[in-house]
Amino acid sequence: MRAVVVVTGLVVVVVATALSLPNHDVKSATSSRSSSDYQGSSGDDCDEGLPPPDQPFRVVWNHPDNCERIKLHLPLDDYGIIFNKLRVFLGEEIQTLYDTGPWPYISETGKFINGGLPQSFNHPDNDGETQRILKKHRPENFTGLGVLDFETWRAIYSTNFGPMTIYQNESVKLVKEQHPDYDQKKLTKVAEKEWQQAAKDIMSNKLKIAQEVMPRGHWGYYLYPRTWDNKRDTKFRNDKINWLWRQSTGLYPSIYIYDFSKTESAITKFVSDTVGEAVRVQKEFSPPNTPIYPYVMFQTMDNIFHYEDHLKISLGLSAKMGAAGVVLWGTSKHYKESTRQWQCQQLQEHIRTVLGPLVKNVTQMMTDCSRAICEGHGRCVHNSHDVILGETESQRLSDLCSTRQSRFRDYHCRCYSAWEGACCQTLRPSRCQKREQRNVHGGGDLID
């Protein structure tokens, strides 16, 4: 993962645009924190698993802090933050996998590893090694979030720029060796075509193996989907890899903030655009139960905790747009043995005073809204933040249900995949035999 730096000026305006939060008593809300078996998963013919009725929005801890090793308790469960048992990094709730077997890449010294390019990938035991690594970390009956993290090159040829330009250059060189008579335009066109196919073969195969080893997990790649220069370019590029959205059973974009100089509205727009693009590809291409969990950084590489106002953008806006939850990630570099005691005490205090109460507030509000206007069968989406329906249609749906609870008059329902109707009041006809379902990670379907 990459670092993010806090912009200290994000205070009044951004808070207003992120999420209006009622002042809940943080001690009053309850939250389930463990998975249970469910019908309907990425490995089933009947893919209609549901989250628990009290958890339309979940916050998942994926921070390798190591505080439990010194017996310093982080009060995650007090605020409904989901975490792996024994606080392991690879566990039953979430697995972010940096090592998924051999990949082709070019080292910093220019050495071609495993062929260097996807087109030249030549590892003799790729599948076997990938399977062994995944099985080594496989929890029993895994139903959690499965995240493959590979960032050395990108699936879309044209997005390998900056330090990754070498992959475009070497791809063109490879074609030229085979076809010295081609002009530059044709060389580039063929190089792009060969790259796209080879990258697809490798990434799709890794994903397939993960889904076979842990078929009930929600599998996808970190940083996919992402946004580019503008919405037109973003759609064009991401549609080129629609095969990835069709195969993924989890979408894990990043909403880390890198640029100090961005204005408050620009930062809010970035988060909105990124989550919105995930909603779009989920609607157009992904299985109906595919959850969206943006990755959120709450502590920078410079060891600065994000202010509450900044976290409200990341958590609040994701919730308002209908994401299934967020993943909280941080670096382990601050939690080395020499400084771990002090760092863990600082982290404990941050959770108690800032992060924890905010998580409780956001999750409780989305729970209350779901129960009030969606009968607990869907997520609430803010009328001004539905990238699929638009504000006019959102308001029409809102008027049908929000009269039940005026507090949520600016929200409408996005039903879970087993339900339909403006207020998610009708069980959809299904070839599947219904039973009590508790898929804690379910993504929910969008209303057509």
Curated annotation (Swiss-Prot):
Q: Which residues form the propeptide?
A: 19-33
Q: What residues form the catalytic site here? A: 151 (proton donor)
Task: Fetch the InterPro entries from UniProt.
Answer: Aldolase_TIM (IPR013785), Glycoside_hydrolase_SF (IPR017853), Hyaluronidase (IPR018155)
Q: What is its EC number?
A: 3.2.1.35
The domain of life is Eukaryota
Protein localization = Secreted
A Gene Ontology cellular component where this protein is annotated is: extracellular region
Q: Which UniProt keywords apply?
A: Disulfide bond, EGF-like domain, Glycoprotein, Glycosidase, Hydrolase, Secreted, Signal
Where do glycans attach?
141, 169, 361
Give me the ranges of the annotated region Disordered. Answer: 26-55
Q: Where is the composition biased (Low complexity)?
A: 31-43
Chief location of this protein within or outside the cell: secreted
Cysteine disulfide partners in this protein: 67-344, 369-380, 374-413, 415-424
* Catalytic reaction(s) noted: Random hydrolysis of (1->4)-linkages between N-acetyl-beta-D-glucosamine and D-glucuronate residues in hyaluronate
Q: What sort of enzyme, by top EC class, is this?
A: hydrolase
Example of a GO biological process term: hyaluronan catabolic process
| Residue ranges occupied by any EGF-like domain in the UniProt entry | 413-424
Other observations noted: Found in both injectable (milked) (IV) and dissected venom (DV).
Q: Which family does it belong to?
A: Belongs to the glycosyl hydrolase 56 family.
PANTHER family named in the record: HYALURONIDASE
Q: What does this protein do?
A: Hyaluronidase catalyzes the hydrolysis of hyaluronic acid (HA), an anionic, nonsulfated glycosaminoglycan distributed widely throughout connective, epithelial, and neural tissues. In venom, they are known to enhance diffusion of the venom by degrading the extracellular matrix.
Task: Quote the protein name from its UniProt record.
Answer: Hyaluronidase conohyal-Cn1
